[in-house]
Amino acid sequence: MKIKILSTGDEIVSGGVVDTNASWLAASLLGLGLTVDCFVAVGDDFGTLRRTIADLAAETDILIVTGGLGPTNDDITAEAAAGAVNTKTILNPEALGLVTDYFNRKGWPMNPSNKKQAVLPRDCRVIENEVGTAPGFYLRISGCHGFFMPGVPKEMKAMTLNWVLPWIQRYAAKNLGRTLTDITPRTITVFGLPESEVGARLKDLATQFPGVRPGFRADFPLIQVKLYPDSEKRGGGENILDQAEQFVVTTLGRWVISREGLTMEQEVGRLLVQKKATIALAESCTGGLMASMLTDVPGSSEYFIFSGVTYSNEAKIRVLGVRQSTLESHGAVSEETAGEMAQGVRRLTQATYGISTSGVAGPGGGSPEKPVGMVCIGIAGPGFCTTKRYGFAFNDRTMNKQIFAVTALGALRKRMLMQGGSV
């Protein structure tokens, strides 16, 4: 089943508005095992829009169009759709009734311009808009099934969930002999391997599991392995996805940090909650990035206590109690200093875990002994303090800070998993 998505509006093609509708639609269709062939966006030019609708409809089974159903002069989708099938628009009584009823329910006066939203192609089927004023419509365009919906996300989503997806499921069952059930794609988060290596290790995945379509998404420094049901080769549905997921986890082993698609900070937060543990941070080279990441997670107040950006040596001494002699003998960027920082912030806050970072983010400031990309990480906990030096080959300050922060959280994750149970 071929599906294409067309988004309309000058605001989209000019870059003024990010088209989130298309990505949401694609994700919703993937849950049924359906792949979108392409996204297309056009502005508010009648001729271009009419031709685009006709051209896309000629080469697809289903065309989903969003935008251009409002009450203003630049809302021209209904007229363009009518032009694509060489018909006229009419004031649709059913659509007019829906628009009028909406205003009556709200107790609002209806502007005469809103009648334009009921002017639809002749012979179309009206799709009710339960959360807005603009009805959508279904239109057969030669052999293509066209669905036209408003561009307002909440209105488009309601129509998709209540009308479009159920229609597609019925169509597939009746005409294609397939039952499209809603199956959640699997997302496995990986850290510590480049995307090319992940792909190489999983090169046989699609062959071994023909009912699964794998995908890879890099979100530095993490990689997400996506497993989608393939509607053309559905096979065992949930069962085949479960098998493929286990194959990925077994193949990638210790590089997998989450089978639920969690980020590193989300996974660390989950473990802290599970262990009823708390965390405090002493950040130098990461400049508060770890704190920002952790507190972006809803519910982080349950485990996050404190973060101090102890950038200078004086701050390390006065706030964390790092010894002057340690700094003089080993320098700020050293495992010795990182260890004392972690112990100091844990002592200061009485947190279960104290985490520290001290490194060279670059692009300048490195030396042969301590090059750009070097970071020392300390973790202090009940009865232990461990440190480790890491080296990365990035000469970009932002990338180094990101990978330093995720590496530090990853080190804590490993430590918590090693301990098992509660702290």
Curated annotation (Swiss-Prot):
Origin superkingdom: Bacteria
Gene3D superfamilies membership: CinA-like, MoaB/Mog-like domain
CDD domains membership: cinA
Transmembrane segments: none
InterPro entries: CinA (IPR050101), CinA-like_C (IPR036653), CinA_C (IPR008136), Competence-induced_CinA (IPR008135), MoaB/Mog-like_dom_sf (IPR036425), MoaB/Mog_dom (IPR001453)
Any Pfam family: MoCF_biosynth
Family membership noted in the UniProt record: Belongs to the CinA family.
Classification via HAMAP family: CinA_B
Protein name, UniProt field: CinA-like protein
Organism: Desulforapulum autotrophicum (strain ATCC 43914 / DSM 3382 / VKM B-1955 / HRM2)
